[in-house]
């Protein structure tokens, strides 16, 4: 039986102060797998942003005073809504983004639910400190919510990244104005429709539209006390500068060119799957994708040949079909970027082992590309240094542990990476030597709540998915008490 794909409203307004506005100027949201329009959404104006910020400021006056018990209860109710609507949200995310439904059903949506439950749990355990400095002086340290936060989320994981941003901010007592990518706004809008009744008006506000318009206006709005962004390093740098100019903090989770390192003694079959998961998950549109595959010389030919055969067997298909393993890129622009880099690799003398072409035929109306493996003669090749953001991995041979560490660290990025070996001492040595914020050992792309995620170098500032995020959405207050009854005698 054909799956019903009519799961969106025709038009979406903005969520401001608990009310859905009447749609104004509209933009189209497309299904990247077939080019069809899914729905229309609002292209917000400066006045819309002003109204959303004002609503968040007003709501903060009371939301900040709610107890951790009250906020935890709401977060758990939000998680319940996600669980109850898993199939709907999974299909909506798949249609809007192009990723296969087996991923949204098993990863994106359940992980989002878990993030709300995680922060509902850890907020109950947060405590201040009190220190008796001496016989007369007591220092009390408290953390208070930072205020109104402006959050901008990317198109590669719109639902999950919204959870990464919203859950800790609400838990900390902040109010929110959040802006999804104009390429993938629909799943967040649908989610907000389902949870709006759970939140006091103005606590969560959603602005949609062009990043160059409403997104840019948000960056310089003086009503924000913090900015948070997930996306490219180029835009992240721009946002960091905007935050610095306003003297407010920013959390930035940015790009990567992660090293997936395979030693001769790797667990072979598991490693084959790990190489695929590192670069084919979400069509390679993952900031921490294992796009540089380093293989030790003793196993190189066997592993690369086997990996190429696995790439050829991947079922690329319509993302809403249950047996599809890899879906569509998010839009035509991203597909063009991928194909451009394949050509750059060829011009640099790299060998295309498999893939590298747009898929035509029955999938010709969509933005589909073959899983691609490129043998790079050098780690200095552009395809080994620049973020492609697609299912394209470069393969590089290495001899020694020292050599691969040097090559892995020879990158402007430092977001993710992995080590594959049955020697735990080697795994720990290499993990400690890698200049990256997340190192997986004998696994890849595991992203649970409770494990801090973020980058070194130009891969960002701050962390996500851990209770330390509560510190990022709060500020420290010190209450200093003198119990001495007499004058100090200083004057």
Please report, for each region that a protein language model flagged, where it lies by residue.
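Long amphipathic alpha-helix in the N-terminal Rossmann-like dinucleotide-binding domain
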Residues: 54, 73-87, 101-126
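Conserved C-terminal structural/oligomerization subdomain of aldehyde/semialdehyde dehydrogenase
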Residues: 34-40, 261, 315, 347, ...
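Short, well-ordered beta-strand elements within core beta-sheets of diverse protein domains
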Residues: 37-44, 58-65, 151, 260-263, ...
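N-terminal alpha-helical segment of soluble enzymes
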Residues: 32-97, 298, 310
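Residue-level signal for inorganic ion chemistry
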Residues: 35, 71, 93, 116, ...
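Rossmann-like NAD(P) dinucleotide-binding subdomain of oxidoreductase/dehydrogenase enzymes
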Residues: 128-270, 398
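ALDH superfamily catalytic-core signature
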Residues: 234-378, 441, 488-490
